[in-house]
Regions:
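C-terminal target-recognition/interaction regions appended to catalytic cores
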Residues: 132-136
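AAA+ P-loop NTPase domains with strong preference for DNA replication initiators
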Residues: 2-127, 140-147, 152-154, 158-164, ...
Length: 169
């Protein structure tokens, strides 16, 4: 959220959106790569990859098919991890803007992110509840987009631009 407070122009919005997606992709790689590599080794061993003999030609075709199926599974799993990472970031932002709304309305409710009270109060003082509602709507819309197979970068770019300037929603 602190990066969101520093957004100055459209370019900085697009850079932040790309950084969010890049971070999600890097996290997905660190989670998925070891598992993917282990699965590939297992499949190759099961089909006798690297072996010699007449019977291995048929196995080679089966191996190629199994590796293609495995690559498709890996791609789906990696995408799911990326989307889950981005969704968690969006949910965290929803909590932040919920707290902003609590402060703006003077509600007698505890803040979810009390450790961020100074930033929350600064954002609350710099805007109106109507703008905060537009931001929350943008966050909900982004969650929907992420679950609807929209390109993650496009969804995050739209979100960050709207968080910077809710009138663009």
């Amino acid at each position: 959220s602190s990066d969101l407070l520093q957004l100055g122009d459209l370019g900085s919005c697009l850079v932040l959106a790309a950084e969010l997606v890049d971070t999600a992709n890097a996290n997905a790689a660190s989670l998925c790569d070891p598992r993917d590599e282990a699965e590939e080794r297992t499949i190759r061993a099961a089909y006798g990859d690297g072996g010699r003999g007449k019977g291995l030609a048929m196995n080679e075709r089966r191996l190629k098919s199994a590796l293609k199926d495995m690559a498709d599974r890996h791609k789906r799993r990696r995408r799911r991890v990326v989307l889950d990472e981005l969704d968690r970031a969006v949910v965290d932002l929803m909590g932040f803007y919920r707290d902003v709304m609590v402060v703006q309305l003077g509600a007698q409710s505890e803040l979810v992110n009390d450790e961020m009270r100074p930033q929350i109060e600064r954002v609350a003082a710099g805007g109106r509840p109507q703008e905060t509602l537009l931001r929350v709507d943008a966050l909900e819309r982004t969650r929907h987009l992420l679950s609807s197979n929209v390109a993650p970068l496009l969804a995050m770019e739209s979100l960050v631009v709207t968080l910077k300037d809710p009138s663009l929603a």
